[in-house]
């Protein structure tokens, strides 16, 4: 009985340590990614998606063909949205 309890507690401790180490490693890998946008840039990216799709929706309502809006800074309009080139 004691051996089983010790084995269960040991497995639980190993699982906790492994999970903690995996979370730390994942956090480090996220921080190490080159070119990963921060929260401010992510908000700008969402605004670009919205701006391009709204622009095309307005043009369609006016019985005009949807002209591609020029997205700047490495972005282009595709399927009514700005996408990263």
Swiss-Prot record:
Give a GO molecular function annotation for the protein: toxin activity
- Alphabetical keyword list: Disulfide bond, Neurotoxin, Postsynaptic neurotoxin, Secreted, Signal, Toxin
Signal sequence residues: 1-22
Q: Which residues form the propeptide?
A: 23-48
- Which tissues is this protein detected in according to the database? Expressed by the venom gland.
InterPro entries on file: Hwtx-2-like
Highest taxon above the source species: Eukaryota
Localization (cell): Secreted
Report the SS bond pairs: 52-66, 56-77, 71-82
Q: One short Pfam family name for this protein?
A: Toxin_20
What Gene Ontology cellular component terms go with this record? extracellular region; host cell postsynaptic membrane
Concerning its family, UniProt says: Belongs to the neurotoxin 12 (Hwtx-2) family. 02 (Hwtx-2) subfamily.
Complex formation: Monomer.
The entry's function note states: Neurotoxin active on both insects and mammals.
**Mind telling me what this protein is named?**
U4-theraphotoxin-Hhn1a
């Amino acid at each position: 009985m004691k051996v089983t309890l010790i084995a269960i507690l040991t497995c639980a401790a190993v699982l906790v340590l492994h999970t903690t180490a995996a979370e730390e490693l994942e956090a480090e890998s996220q921080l190490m990614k080159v070119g990963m946008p921060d929260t401010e840039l992510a908000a700008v990216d969402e605004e670009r998606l919205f701006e391009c799709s709204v622009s095309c929706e307005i043009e369609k309502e006016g019985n005009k063909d949807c002209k591609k809006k020029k997205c700047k800074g490495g972005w282009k309009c595709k399927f009514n949205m700005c996408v990263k080139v």
